[in-house]
């Protein structure tokens, strides 16, 4: 989708076994990249994700989306251990991270769509922002709005929320002048104060939270 919608920023796939992916040159590791990455999309097996986050931060990245599953959504000891290690790595590196176990994000104004959805997306900076833990439901909400001619400026799937949580996104959307309506899907609220503060920020900005 990054190629399909002609994202204008640099695209630097890291894959030691391939030279090209979708016509885009691959690099063997972070050290080989021609410039510092701004955002890293993590698609490696769970056992490698923690090191990728640390390597991304060392390479100068500021944020990451971890699509990889196999963490706290599973109950086995190894998955729980990896989840704890990932959370610690995010804390230590200071990266702004969505996921793991999520389905990517949309920033329409930037033609940035890191989701596997192959349905047509109108890349216009709409006035609605969506965030939530269930990627499938968030994607369904976006599609329902799209079908009704309602523009979606941002869509963020947060998954297990090892880093950023949905209320963090709500606060960001509340401060963004391009957004008029905030839609969220919550499976739970870990920090009720942060959630209340995000709701208050949206109310102060005159933006309904649905």
Segments from the language model and where they lie:
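Catalytic-core regions of core metabolic enzymes
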Residues: 1-210
């Amino acid at each position: 989708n990054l190629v399909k919608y002609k994202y204008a920023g640099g695209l630097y796939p890291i894959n030691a076994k391939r030279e090209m992916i979708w016509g885009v040159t691959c690099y063997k590791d972070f050290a080989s990249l021609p410039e510092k990455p701004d955002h890293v999309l993590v698609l490696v097996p769970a056992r490698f994700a923690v090191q990728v986050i640390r390597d991304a931060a060392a390479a100068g990245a500021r944020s990451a989306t971890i699509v990889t599953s196999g963490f706290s959504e599973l109950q086995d000891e190894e998955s729980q251990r990896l989840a704890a290690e990932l959370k610690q790595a995010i804390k230590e590196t200071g990266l702004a991270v969505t996921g793991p176990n999520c389905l990517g994000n949309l920033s329409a104004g930037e033609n940035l769509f890191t989701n596997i959805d192959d349905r047509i997306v109108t890349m216009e900076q709409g006035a609605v922002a969506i965030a939530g833990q269930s990627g499938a439901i968030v994607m369904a909400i976006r599609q329902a709005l799209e079908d009704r001619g309602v523009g979606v400026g941002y869509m963020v799937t947060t998954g297990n929320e090892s880093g950023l949580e949905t209320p963090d996104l709500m606060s960001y959307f509340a401060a963004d002048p391009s957004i008029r309506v905030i839609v969220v899907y919550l499976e739970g609220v870990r920090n009720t104060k942060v959630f209340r503060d995000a709701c208050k920020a949206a109310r102060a900005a005159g933006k309904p939270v649905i």
